[in-house]
C-alpha cells in the first residue's frame, strides 16, 4: 500500500516547498523506496499552459504531453521517476471533472458540494497519481490560510484519516524571518502558521523552518514547545548557494528518519554519494564560460528554470562554471547586437508572440556571422531559420505567420495537422482554443548520419515538444540549397526537428544548432544532457580560441 507525505507551506509563498519535497524524495529513493511526487495547484486554470510566464514562471512539459507546474521539473531532476499528467492537477481540473459527472447524473440527484464531492475527487486524483509507488510526496500549493487551498487541505486530512495509522505524514514548511532592527530570528509567524494548520485538523509531524541562517537550538526548542512538534522534528533549512545541497542538509538533521518512523517503514540506509559528487563538481570547476541568453522574459528568470538548470548540469559534466547573463531581446532590437561579442556562446530560448522577435533574429545573425556558438530552442530555431532565409537563401521577406499573418514568404507557419506523442492525429486552426492545442510531449525521430546532431545523439532522438508553429516545408528545400542542414525530421509529417550549419565549406560554423523541441526538460544533474554538454564544450573552445588570438 502506498504511504503519503503531504508537504504544506505557511507564512509566505515561494519558500521552496517543491525543492524541499524533491529533496526528501531523493533521500527516500536513495533508501531503496519507489517514490513519486504530486503537485496540487489551487488556481482555477485548467493548467498553466495559457498563463503568462510573468504570472506563473516556466511551464514544464511531461513525456505524455501535460503542461504542468515548474515544480515537476524539480521533481524529475531530483528523483529518477518520470512525471506524468497524473502528477499535477488544479482546482480547475477538479471542478471540471465534478461538473462533468454531475451533468452525466453520476451523483444521482444529490446536491453537489465541496464536501464530500470536491474533496473526494481530490483524493481520487491523489490515489491515481500515487498508484504503484511505495511513497508519494504530495505538495499542496499556496499557503495555509488561503481560501483556495482549503479543499486540498481538507482532502489531505480526510485521506490521512481514512488510510489509517502510519499511512500518512505531514511536513510543514514555514518562514522564520530575521529582523535586522531586533537582531534576532522571530518564531511567532511559524507558531501562528502551525496553529492555523491545526485548526484545519492537521498536526505536522515535522517542521521545516526556512531562514537566511541556521536556527539556534534554543529557537528550535521554542518552536517545538509552541507548535507541539518534537524538537528533533524542527528542522533548520537555511539559504544554500545551490539547491543540490538540500538533500544532505535534510538528511543530516534526520528528516527521512522521522518520516520513515511515522510511516512505519524500515528501508535500507541512505546513500547520498551522488549528491556529494555533484556539489563537489559545482564548487570546484576547472573552467568557466559566460552564456548570453537572449529572451523576452528576462525579468523573471523562473520562466527559464529548466533551461538554466540544464546549462548548470552541462557545467557539472564539463567541469565548468556556467555564468548566464540574461539579455532583453527588445533592447538588442533597439541598440543592435554588438553587445553579444563578449559572450562565449549565445542561446535563444523558446517563447511566444511578436514582441522582441527582431532582436532575437539579430542575435542569430550576429552569432552566425561572427562564428560564436549558437543554440536556438523552439522559437530560437525558428528565428535562426528566418534569419538564414532572409540573409543567405534570398528569401528577403521571410517571416513567421505568428509575427506577420500576411507575410509573403512564411518560412515558419502554423501546422494544422500532426501526430502527437501517442500516435493520435491532432488538428487545429487559427480559431482553435489556445489551451491544449500545441504539439506536446515526447516524440522520436531519426537523425541524419554525418551531422553534428548525429555526433551528439546517435541514430535517433526522443525529446519533448511544446509549440504551435513549425518550419514550412514549402520553403525548407530552398534554404537547404543555400547550405542549411536539416539533420532530423518527424517520421510522419517530415517536419524539421533539428537544423544546423555545416562545419566545413562556404557557410561553415563551429557550432550552430537549432532544435524545435525543448531538450532542457530531459536534463538532470546526474546525467546532464548531450546537447547542452556539447554546447558548453563549444563555448569553452570558442573562449580558448578568442584568448589565443589576444595572446598572438
Curated annotation (Swiss-Prot):
InterPro entries for this protein: Class_I_gatase-like (IPR029062), CTP_synthase (IPR004468), CTP_synthase_N (IPR017456), GATASE (IPR017926), GATase1_CTP_Synthase (IPR033828), P-loop_NTPase (IPR027417)
Binding site for ATP: 14-19, 71
Pfam families, A to Z: CTP_synth_N (PF06418), GATase (PF00117)
Active site as annotated: 378 (nucleophile), 518, 520
Regulation: Allosterically activated by GTP, when glutamine is the substrate; GTP has no effect on the reaction when ammonia is the substrate. The allosteric effector GTP functions by stabilizing the protein conformation that binds the tetrahedral intermediate(s) formed during glutamine hydrolysis. Inhibited by the product CTP, via allosteric rather than competitive inhibition.
Alphabetized PANTHER family for the sequence: CTP SYNTHASE (PTHR11550), CTP SYNTHASE-RELATED (PTHR11550:SF0)
Protein name: CTP synthase
Gene source species: Herminiimonas arsenicoxydans
Gene: pyrG
